[in-house]
């Protein structure tokens, strides 16, 4: 695996590597979930490119950008072991050159609710940086984690507006032994915060899945089951627990029955704050 830091090095390296090319965009602090993305890309592409870039445009302030974990040495080891051919680790000026003003990219209609409402401008930043990486890497396909359910749908919408027909793939969420979805943000949790997150967020979603499988379809009843778990832990602050049509993110009413709400899957999304760290997770109900 080769590591490059500039656009010129990236272009030179890509010219020497075979196509099709798969891109795995990340912000670093890589873990087994990222390894699963890289492994999935490896199965289909001749060349796998992993990018590491902490994108300032998707954060609310500079302090949040500075706080984000950076572990380049271990990231290089994980990316190579998982099957990456090329690691692109640009600085801000390589992605957003001062001499080339980069306009924001429209994130589309799926970006207005949930994370879009709680974090204004976040998905504009996400759509902009992913579009920029698509421009630089020119991949045939790109891989994203299903945990970030709204994000991957926003990226699918954005990619569909482009002329280069990049295929977007969702990869199943990887969870730790305690059920918590793997996330680079988990590194920012205290030991007690980690325990609190693990005994609420995945447990609440599992209760929903189990109740639905046993025949409970009322959105109101499923919500009550999950919220009871989360509100019992005072160190966990729930932002939202949302039931929506999986394809459109149109929310289901409290009186709706999950099985009758709409054709296709129902997306259950959850966001909570623990130790000042925002954690998100999601499951789908068939």
PLM regions and their residue ranges:
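Nucleotidyltransferase catalytic core that binds NTPs
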Residues: 2-235, 244, 276, 283
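Phosphate/ribose-recognition catalytic cores of enzymes acting on nucleotide-derived substrates
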Residues: 225-286
